């Protein structure tokens, strides 16, 4: 991955506080939004982190099937990111505290949400992503992180 691609991904992710996550349970899809914070984009990895209400359907679905689809972008898409990822529920208390702190720094709304409800911290290891840009610049930026879950249509 070249520096331009890395910078494109980082700049895109920094603009948004929430993502849409698609989970599945027994063949039934479920899509909802969650607050997220991004880790660094490296040659081999991109991790996103979020908190999920402990009694939520999406968290229960992740326990059964950690493979997810992601969408980040505006309501009227002119530029958007779609991705596949593998979710894991964090158990290390310092890692959980770090996710909550970083979410609060990125989004005051997320901080208020986290303070009001019991949450679990989740790591999303991105396998594949594509940014589509209809407003100028490269139309598509696509990256695979060397995994078995290629994206695309």
Language-model regions, residue ranges each:
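Short beta-strand segments
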Residues: 16-54, 60-62, 68-72, 80-84
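Short, surface-exposed beta-strand-loop junctions and turns on beta-sheet-rich folds
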Residues: 56-58, 77, 137-139
């Amino acid at each position: 991955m070249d520096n331009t691609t890395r910078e494109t991904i980082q700049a895109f992710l920094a603009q948004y506080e929430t993502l849409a996550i698609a989970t599945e349970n027994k063949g039934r899809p479920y899509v909802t939004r969650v607050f997220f914070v991004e880790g660094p984009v490296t040659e081999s990895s991109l991790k996103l982190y979020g908190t999920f209400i402990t009694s939520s359907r999406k968290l229960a679905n992740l326990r059964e099937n950690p493979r997810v689809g992601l969408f980040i972008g505006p309501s009227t898409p002119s530029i958007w990111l779609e991705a596949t990822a593998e979710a894991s529920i964090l158990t290390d208390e310092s890692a959980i505290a770090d996710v909550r702190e970083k979410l609060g720094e990125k989004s005051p709304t997320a901080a208020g949400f986290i303070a009001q409800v019991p949450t679990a911290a989740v790591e999303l290891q991105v396998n594949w992503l594509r940014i589509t840009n209809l407003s100028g610049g490269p139309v598509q930026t696509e990256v695979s992180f060397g995994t078995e879950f290629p994206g695309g249509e």
